[in-house]
A protein has these predicted regions:
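AAA+/P-loop NTPase substrate/partner-engagement loops
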Residues: 259-292, 299-304
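Interdomain "pre-motor" coupling segment immediately N-terminal to P-loop NTPase/helicase cores
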Residues: 135-199
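Conserved AAA+ ATPase "SRH/arginine-finger" region at the nucleotide-binding site
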Residues: 349-364, 371-385
Length: 439
């Protein structure tokens, strides 16, 4: 195995925590014959333990060794893989190097650990090659990754030669991409040890769809039209969803990533205090072959906050042009985002050479940089009742509409007023607490 791994070219720079290189070193030590049996066995168990951890995190099953090799192939963000993401393989000499590496991976797929097991009196490699995972009834956060990697693993097992292996891997890159950007829908920003922003996958995204959002058809249509244009590579605008709380603004944004993930849409959630990192985040993603929505939830600024200046420069106004594969979508309960004061409205007062009206115009100019603004207003009483009844049907609650409306009226009086959120909370209450089986 050590000889095989040492001959890799394109896939040479494996992740620092990979298991392939340590296992290759173990096999080399065994082949040389100069080893301590107990120490070598302990080293093997250490790597198998890590493999079991990975299998548990991602829900791998059957052949964990094959699953892991497939996982390595879809995780390595090398130049070849990145050029293939969302477009597939292109003609070029690099394909010969790729097929060279894939021939090695195909040999690793069929690597025989039996001699090692017999000599050390172990059977762990046989066990991980015929592994039966414990079925989890609870929600699996990495189900999306698990299903894709296992499907690729099964396809690679059937590949007859390096050409078929090449076709399977590059098709995966075409369909989903590579690395964390290819395997995950959404990300948050964290500070790496070096102090630079790092994209961290969000594994437990909400599985909401537009069919789950009752009402607001015009608003959803405008949002979909803009996003479809963006995903298709046509001109599109930054979007601001504003209006009353609990009306489905954030849910509409979340539904987008579930609808368009397979078409290359990715979402990055960012908070106000991270706006100064926006330029560095954009630098990391601008050359990747995906469409990115930078998502800002509940966006608003108080008079003393200046983070909006970073946002203005990124949206429009800085020297560097915003890349075509990036848009900013924000939600807010405020129409103008930045809190105004009466001093801002004073056209006469001057302080330090700056007219207060100029200050107000600077603040108001932020919202004007969102080319698409969509208003989500509070539903009427009739619309609220319709939302309640539709949600009840979706959840299989067989209750009369009159009864639902009467109870929903009582509920909203004590739970924040009329809104889609209030309706959903009422349905949650009916499902989880109340016993209306005789109604």
């Amino acid at each position: 195995m050590h000889k095989l791994v040492s001959q890799l070219v394109i896939y040479r720079n494996l992740p620092a925590d990979n298991l392939l290189e340590p296992l290759a070193e173990i096999c080399a030590e065994f082949a040389a014959g100069d080893y301590n049996r107990e120490e070598l066995t302990a080293e093997i168990y250490e790597q198998v333990h890590k493999l079991l951890d990975i299998g548990t995190v991602y829900g791998f099953d059957k052949n964990l060794w094959h699953n892991y090799l497939a996982f390595l192939l879809v995780s390595c963000e090398n130049p070849f893989a990145i050029t293939c993401e969302k477009v597939g393989a292109c003609e070029g000499s690099v394909n010969r190097f790729a097929k060279h590496d894939f021939k090695i991976f195909q040999q690793l797929f069929t690597y025989d650990f039996s001699e090692l097991e017999r000599a050390l009196g172990i059977n762990c490699f046989s066990l991980i090659s015929n592994y039966q995972a414990v079925v989890k009834q609870e929600r699996r956060y990495n189900k999306n990754i698990s299903e894709k990697v296992q499907a690729l693993s099964a396809a690679l097992e059937k590949a007859a030669d390096a050409d078929e292996f090449f076709a399977c891997v590059t098709k995966f890159y075409h369909d989903y991409g590579v690395g964390k950007l290819g395997l995950n829908k959404a990300f948050r920003i964290a500070q790496a040890q070096q102090g630079e922003p790092e994209l961290v996958p969000i594994s437990n995204t909400e599985q909401i769809t537009f069919a789950d959002l009752i009402g607001y058809e015009d608003q959803k249509q405008r949002l979909l039209e803009n996003t479809e244009a963006f995903v298709a590579g046509r001109p599109a605008n930054n979007v601001l969803l504003f209006g009353d709380s609990g009306t489905g603004k954030s849910s509409s944004i979340k539904a987008l990533i579930n609808k368009y993930y397979d078409q290359g849409l990715r979402m990055i959630e960012i908070y106000k205090h991270q706006f100064r990192d926006l330029s560095q985040v954009i630098a990391q993603i601008k050359n990747r072959n995906y469409r990115f929505i930078i998502y800002m939830d509940d966006l608003s600024f108080e008079e003393f906050e200046i983070e909006y200046k970073y946002l203005k420069a990124i949206i429009e106004g800085g020297l560097e042009v915003r890349p075509d594969n990036i848009l900013i979508y924000a939600t807010s309960n405020r129409r103008h985002l930045i809190n105004e004061t009466w001093k801002d409205r004073n056209d006469v007062t001057q302080e330090d050479g700056i007219y207060k009206s100029d200050t107000m115009q600077e603040k108001l100019s932020l919202v004007n940089r969102f080319g698409c603004t969509i208003y989500y207003g509070q539903p009427t009483q009739k619309e609220y009742y319709k939302i309640v009844c539709e949600l009840a049907k979706k959840q299989g609650l067989e209750l009369a509409d009159d009864f639902l409306c009467a109870e929903a009226r009582k509920w909203e009086l004590h739970h924040g007023g009329i809104s889609g959120r209030t309706a959903q909370q009422f349905i949650n209450y009916l499902q989880g607490v109340a016993d209306f089986s005789k109604k």
